[in-house]
Structures are given as C-alpha cells and as structure tokens.
Amino acid sequence: AAAPSPNDKETKQKLTDLGVQRAKQWGWVNTYTYTKSLGEQLIAMEPGLRYTIVRPAIVEAALDYPFPGWVEGGRTAAPLVMMAMQGLRHWPVREDAPMEVVPVDQVAGAIILAGALLLHHEAAPVYHLATADRNPVSYGQIIRWINAEYLKDNRKIKLLTPGVVVMTPEVARSRGQLVSRKLTGIYEFLTEVRQFAQKNKLPFAKRLTKLGNNIRMITRQLSIREAALELYQPFLYDNRFIFESENIRTAHARLSEEEQRKLPWWPERIRWRHYWTVNELRGIQKWVEGESTKAYSFKL
C-alpha cells in the first residue's frame, strides 16, 4: 500500500497530535516552543560552532524606532487586541499573570549587541529578551486598558455593560457552548419561519434570509474566538511566565551612553498603559487590522 501523503488531512491531524504529545512530554506548552527548543539543541550540539541564542518574548509594536507603533503583520497579541477592541468582555485569564511582551525595536538592538559580542568571543550562551522580571504588566491590566479605549469609542455601550469579566477557561467554555446552542436554536427557528414565508410568498421572507445569514456569521465568529482563546490558554491562564533577562542587561551596561542610545534596552522605562493604548493598539489598527477583520464581532 502507498504511504500516506503528509498533505492528507487525516495524516496532518495525526502529526499535529503527535507533536502536541511530544511537546507536553518534555514540558513545552505547544509544538511551536517545542520545535524552537529542538533547533537550539541542534545548534548547541554542533562541534566547534561559536554561537549565542537570543530568545525574545512576544515581539510587538515599536516603542520608538522607526516610529512609535510600527508593527508588521499580525503579531501574537494582535488577535487579543482586536477581540478587546471589538467588545469582548469575558476573558479566561489569570489577572496577575504577566504578559511577557517586548517592543520590536528593543529586540533589534539587543540582537545587534549579542551579535557584536559573539564576534568578540564574549557572548553569553543565551540572552532572554523579556520585560516582566523588571517591569511586569498583567493580562488583567491590559484587557481593562483596551476595554476602556473601546468604551471611549462606544459611549452608549458603556451605559449598558459592567465592563470586563474575568473567568476560568472552564466557565468560558461552558458559556461559549451555551451561547452557541442558543444561536443554533435561533437560526433553526428563523429557517422554519423563512421557509413558511417563502412558501406563502410573504413580504418579509428576504429580511429573514438576511437575519439568518447574520446569525450564521455570528456563530462562526464565536467559533473562531473560542478556538483562539483555547490556543492562548497556556499563556493566559495555565502558566505564569517570567523570563530572567540579566544577561542582556549586563551586556547593555558595557556600552557607552552614546551606544546605549543607538541600541536601546530599557524595559524598565516603558510606560505600559501608554504603550498598549497608543503604540500597540493604534499600531495594530493602522498596520494590521484589515477591512475583513473589521466586520467581525467578538462582543459575545
């Protein structure tokens, strides 16, 4: 019999499941972090190879360079920011868990610095590029800051909603399933009424068709949102990651003041509320959020 194609849907799923199983076996939260660790081990095993490994946390919008808020592509936090800015209030997060985020321009400067030290045979084996060990910001703070920005743009909603609600993943899943069942019931009812209206040539049949399509779209959006939050659960709720970044601080301290200005590494100076509501939020809205995503609603 012919070997199964790696592009076959069933084979892809089996490979994905195997990757997740192996990742968890070795203590990694997903296959992404697991495969990165494999790459690092291959580098470390190479005889005679001089190397340094740079491990940035979640890389997001620029702090200053090339200008505040510059971001290319939908980075890791972009879906979460867009959910918050489109009205999502119910979040399965640990309030006190820090979000390990580092601006892209700080990462770029640190990589150049690590490379220069490697050329001089003075680099450490590993450089963590993170912020929470000196200047932590929690998920609870971030989602409330962004929700406040959302309410500024939607003042009528502010009068009707109690704000952000934090819950466990189990409660969030149960709530999502309940909403999904209700939407399915509404859609099935509308379908029956629409079919009756069409059969009897009633004037509101077209409006029922449009309403039914809207319900289907909302149900699909709910499914996408639930899948995204499930993907982020190891970071939002299951773990409390803080990465020690002493090596890059020590390296940066060796530079002159002029060199430090050219290659900045100052996480402790970041004003997080301003960063998230101006640099990150406005950067995503300007450079990432396309017309297709603006049609999606995450208010449920």
Report residues per predicted region:
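Mid/C-terminal beta-alpha module of Rossmann-like enzyme folds, strongest
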Residues: 117-232, 250-254, 258-267, 276, ...
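Active-site rim elements
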Residues: 26-32, 93-100, 130, 230-239, ...
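Conserved beta-loop-beta element that borders a ligand/cofactor-binding pocket
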Residues: 9-17, 21-33, 37-66, 120-127
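Alpha-helical substrate-binding/gating segment
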Residues: 44-46, 77-127, 131-156
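Catalytic cores of eukaryotic secretory-pathway lumenal/extracellular enzymes that build
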Residues: 2-24, 65-71, 77-95, 101
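First extracellular/luminal loop
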Residues: 1-27, 259-284, 288
